[in-house]
A protein has these predicted regions:
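A general structural signal for well-ordered alpha-helical packing
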Residues: 1-4, 21, 36-37
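Rossmann-like dinucleotide/flavin-binding elements
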Residues: 1-17, 85, 126-127
Length: 149
Protein backbone atom coordinates (compact mmCIF):
# COMPACT_ATOMS: atom_id res chain seq x y z
CA UNK A 1 0.00 0.00 0.00
CA UNK A 2 2.95 2.36 0.47
CA UNK A 3 3.37 2.72 -3.29
CA UNK A 4 -0.33 3.30 -3.95
CA UNK A 5 -0.69 5.73 -1.04
CA UNK A 6 2.38 7.68 -2.15
CA UNK A 7 1.60 7.93 -5.86
CA UNK A 8 -2.19 7.87 -5.96
CA UNK A 9 -3.37 8.87 -2.52
CA UNK A 10 -1.12 11.87 -1.89
CA UNK A 11 0.06 10.30 1.39
CA UNK A 12 3.79 9.69 1.23
CA UNK A 13 4.69 6.47 3.04
CA UNK A 14 7.83 4.44 3.34
CA UNK A 15 7.28 0.68 3.61
CA UNK A 16 8.46 -1.08 6.78
CA UNK A 17 10.56 -3.89 5.37
CA UNK A 18 11.48 -5.41 8.75
CA UNK A 19 8.15 -7.23 9.03
CA UNK A 20 7.99 -8.66 5.51
CA UNK A 21 7.64 -12.43 5.58
CA UNK A 22 9.57 -14.47 3.05
CA UNK A 23 9.65 -18.16 2.22
CA UNK A 24 11.63 -20.59 0.14
CA UNK A 25 9.28 -23.28 -1.13
CA UNK A 26 11.80 -26.09 -0.96
CA UNK A 27 11.26 -29.32 0.92
CA UNK A 28 11.00 -28.58 3.73
CA UNK A 29 10.03 -24.90 3.39
CA UNK A 30 12.13 -22.16 4.95
CA UNK A 31 10.23 -19.18 6.34
CA UNK A 32 11.41 -15.98 7.95
CA UNK A 33 10.03 -12.71 9.20
CA UNK A 34 11.80 -9.88 10.97
CA UNK A 35 15.48 -9.57 11.71
CA UNK A 36 18.18 -12.21 11.57
CA UNK A 37 20.07 -12.85 14.80
CA UNK A 38 23.03 -10.75 13.59
CA UNK A 39 20.73 -7.88 12.56
CA UNK A 40 18.85 -8.04 15.87
CA UNK A 41 22.08 -7.90 17.90
CA UNK A 42 23.35 -4.99 15.78
CA UNK A 43 20.10 -3.06 16.26
CA UNK A 44 19.16 -3.91 19.86
CA UNK A 45 22.46 -5.00 21.42
CA UNK A 46 21.03 -7.79 23.57
CA UNK A 47 18.75 -10.51 22.20
CA UNK A 48 17.21 -13.56 23.88
CA UNK A 49 17.10 -16.58 21.56
CA UNK A 50 14.53 -19.37 21.74
CA UNK A 51 14.93 -22.32 19.40
CA UNK A 52 13.63 -25.82 18.99
CA UNK A 53 14.41 -28.83 16.83
CA UNK A 54 11.67 -31.42 16.95
CA UNK A 55 10.07 -34.28 15.04
CA UNK A 56 6.58 -33.30 13.80
CA UNK A 57 3.76 -35.55 14.94
CA UNK A 58 3.02 -36.68 11.38
CA UNK A 59 6.57 -38.04 11.16
CA UNK A 60 6.10 -40.14 14.28
CA UNK A 61 3.26 -41.87 12.46
CA UNK A 62 4.37 -41.73 8.81
CA UNK A 63 7.98 -42.57 9.57
CA UNK A 64 7.35 -45.03 12.40
CA UNK A 65 9.45 -47.64 10.63
CA UNK A 66 12.54 -45.39 10.94
CA UNK A 67 14.73 -45.00 13.99
CA UNK A 68 13.82 -41.76 15.84
CA UNK A 69 17.17 -40.21 14.81
CA UNK A 70 16.35 -40.79 11.12
CA UNK A 71 12.93 -39.12 11.16
CA UNK A 72 12.36 -35.67 9.70
CA UNK A 73 13.11 -32.72 11.95
CA UNK A 74 11.72 -29.20 11.98
CA UNK A 75 13.55 -26.15 13.35
CA UNK A 76 12.12 -22.93 14.79
CA UNK A 77 13.78 -19.85 16.24
CA UNK A 78 12.40 -16.75 17.95
CA UNK A 79 14.48 -13.61 18.58
CA UNK A 80 13.42 -11.28 21.40
CA UNK A 81 14.76 -7.83 22.33
CA UNK A 82 15.58 -8.24 26.03
CA UNK A 83 14.87 -4.59 26.87
CA UNK A 84 11.26 -4.63 25.63
CA UNK A 85 10.36 -8.36 25.35
CA UNK A 86 9.35 -7.54 21.76
CA UNK A 87 9.66 -10.38 19.22
CA UNK A 88 11.96 -9.06 16.48
CA UNK A 89 12.47 -12.18 14.35
CA UNK A 90 11.03 -15.63 13.68
CA UNK A 91 12.71 -18.23 11.48
CA UNK A 92 11.42 -21.71 10.69
CA UNK A 93 12.25 -24.77 8.64
CA UNK A 94 9.08 -26.83 8.30
CA UNK A 95 6.40 -27.85 5.82
CA UNK A 96 4.11 -24.92 4.95
CA UNK A 97 6.50 -22.35 6.43
CA UNK A 98 5.21 -19.76 3.97
CA UNK A 99 1.67 -20.15 5.29
CA UNK A 100 2.91 -20.08 8.86
CA UNK A 101 4.94 -16.88 8.46
CA UNK A 102 2.09 -14.72 7.18
CA UNK A 103 0.27 -14.70 10.52
CA UNK A 104 3.44 -14.14 12.49
CA UNK A 105 4.35 -11.25 10.15
CA UNK A 106 1.16 -9.50 11.29
CA UNK A 107 2.05 -10.18 14.92
CA UNK A 108 5.58 -8.78 14.56
CA UNK A 109 4.28 -5.75 12.63
CA UNK A 110 1.89 -5.09 15.54
CA UNK A 111 4.71 -5.34 18.11
CA UNK A 112 3.92 -8.72 19.70
CA UNK A 113 5.88 -9.52 22.84
CA UNK A 114 7.17 -12.92 23.92
CA UNK A 115 4.84 -12.74 26.93
CA UNK A 116 1.86 -12.31 24.59
CA UNK A 117 2.96 -15.28 22.50
CA UNK A 118 3.30 -17.33 25.70
CA UNK A 119 -0.35 -16.55 26.54
CA UNK A 120 -1.51 -17.88 23.17
CA UNK A 121 -3.05 -21.33 23.09
CA UNK A 122 -1.71 -23.16 20.06
CA UNK A 123 -3.74 -25.29 17.69
CA UNK A 124 -2.76 -28.92 18.20
CA UNK A 125 -1.16 -30.57 16.33
CA UNK A 126 0.38 -27.82 14.18
CA UNK A 127 3.84 -26.43 13.54
CA UNK A 128 2.65 -23.00 14.73
CA UNK A 129 1.93 -24.51 18.13
CA UNK A 130 5.67 -24.99 18.61
CA UNK A 131 6.24 -21.23 18.31
CA UNK A 132 3.77 -20.38 21.08
CA UNK A 133 4.96 -23.10 23.45
CA UNK A 134 8.70 -22.30 23.52
CA UNK A 135 9.11 -21.06 27.08
CA UNK A 136 12.82 -21.36 27.80
CA UNK A 137 15.45 -19.30 26.02
CA UNK A 138 18.49 -21.30 24.90
CA UNK A 139 20.95 -18.41 24.93
CA UNK A 140 21.38 -14.65 24.84
CA UNK A 141 23.37 -12.90 22.11
CA UNK A 142 25.14 -9.57 22.45
CA UNK A 143 27.81 -7.73 20.49
CA UNK A 144 30.33 -9.30 22.87
CA UNK A 145 29.19 -12.87 22.18
CA UNK A 146 26.78 -15.60 23.25
CA UNK A 147 25.81 -16.69 26.77
CA UNK A 148 24.10 -20.07 27.17
CA UNK A 149 21.21 -20.12 29.62
Amino acid sequence: HAFADTFYGNRARVPDLEAVATAVFSYPNVGTVGLTEAEAVAKYGHVRVYNSTYTPLKCHVGQAHLDIKERSKDYMKILVDTATDKVVGIHVITDNAGELMQGFACAIKCGVTKAQMDLTIGIHPTAAEELVTMRTAKYEATKEGVTKL
